[in-house]
Amino acid sequence: MAYKIVLDAGHGGTDPGAIYKERKEKDDNLELTRVVGKILEDNGIDVVYTRTTDVYQTPFEKARIANEVGADYFISFHRNSSPKENQYQGVEVLIYDKSGIKYEMAQNIEGALGELGFKELGVKARPGLVVLRKTRMPALLIETGFINSESDNQLYDEKKQETAKAIATAVLGTLSDETIEQPLYYRVQTGAFRRRENADQTMHQPTDQGFPVIPSL
């Protein structure tokens, strides 16, 4: 099965996102998105980008793109920011709620980035975020380190290719483990009898109509 994944470089255009010194979040987001996308494409994934240039889109437009192309997954790339310089470090992955394959994928991405040296801040539910709430497929938002953390920026810059590969590998690994949920069946009791012959007589009715019957005591 060829999966279709929408990759979103957060912010863009007139919305720079978080800014630290000469660094703009929108630029980091776009660069990482394109590298991750190339790795996924090389592994047979149909990748759709919300943007490949420095343009502005509302979160609603980003979600609309994912819905219109019928994506199987939506992944948005961001950098975090703290009130004070070097106050916090680490990565976190945001999802609508902690359930399903999106939760598994988020945990895999978080763990993969942790192995590179980023502090793991955990997978968190953020149902209020538009790109997580308005998308009709499993959606994740990755906060790849704090843009105003010197240690995070150093790790981000020195291991940019490794960071992209870690994210892409975690995504691909989750997809390879994806299973189809088994359908749910309900048991229907047609009667309870003291005499065996009455039970046998009743049992013939659904059998004649093609339904399997399993007698129990």
Task: Label every model-predicted segment.
Residues 18, 55, 188:
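Generic anion/oxyanion-binding catalytic loop in active/binding sites
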Residues 2-4, 23-181, 200:
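Active-site-proximal helix/loop segments of hydrolytic enzymes
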Residues 3-22:
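Short glycine-rich His-centered loop
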Residues 12, 80, 193:
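Active-site beta-loop-alpha junctions enriched in small/polar residues
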Residues 9, 51-52, 95, 190-192:
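Short glycine-centered, acidic/aromatic-flanked micro-motifs in structured strand/loop junctions
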Residues 180-217:
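Solvent-exposed beta-strand motifs enriched in subsets of small alpha/beta binding domains
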